[in-house]
Amino acid sequence: QLLGIARLLEQGERQIARNEAQAVINSHLATLRDLQLPEHQHDRLRNEIKSLGRDLLHEVREDVRVVVDAALHDRLASFGERLSARLFAAALSNAGVAAVPVASSDFVLTCDNFRDAKPQLERTCRRGRDILLPLLESGIVPVVTGFIGATQDGRITTMGRNSSDFSAAIIAYVVDAQELVIWTDVDGIYTANPRESVEARLLHEMSYEEARALAEAGANVLHPGVLPLASQSAMTVWVRNTFRPHLRGTRIGPAHSGGVA
């Protein structure tokens, strides 16, 4: 929907774009109501959502002709994560899990190649550890926005198509995690696309090299930035199904015992 707003602006449909932006805000406010939070928490979060909503509406104002460039695209795209991270952290807190939203743009430093920005890993690690490690050491779960970074001067960037996996790998690398779990809509990595081939078989175990070779052969396995980070830190990567969490999925690591299901 947010990317659709950018397209509407390109077409000069500013009023429709503004209506869509308001619909995004209303949707998140409705989700907030559904969470049934304690009054003080509800009111605080409602104010945060409305504040972000005003920022979103400012990007699609009717009285000024908006220049629709890659930088605006990234700013618009970022609002979904920034809103949902707050709601998810609140839901966790209400369920008894200490959690806070964290803006990845506060520590993921990137170049200014908007829509396909590359992270500056060393500086990202330093900044990320300063923010994330104290939270983790205090038993607080950081709910970090995905696929978003920022330039040195604070302009919002995104790291390209399907870069949420990459964001997760960066965060795992920053905190020196032993495991990274990628939640998707399939049961793991297959020998072929299971939607296209009845002969596709689920792979239970893969090495980094095997997963990389499969990706280079054209398989839509993981974002290409995930495996280099995982192999550098000997991190185990799991690919599992969000809708069937009881299944083991595929394990990618330094070594494996092999196996097609």
Task: Tell where the protein language model's regions lie, with residue ranges.
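A conserved regulatory-domain signal marking ACT and ACT-like small-molecule sensing domains
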Residues: R251-A261
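A conserved active-site cap/scaffold subdomain adjacent to cofactor or substrate pockets
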Residues: S207-G253
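Nucleotide/pyrophosphate-binding catalytic subdomain
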Residues: Q1-L222, V226-L227
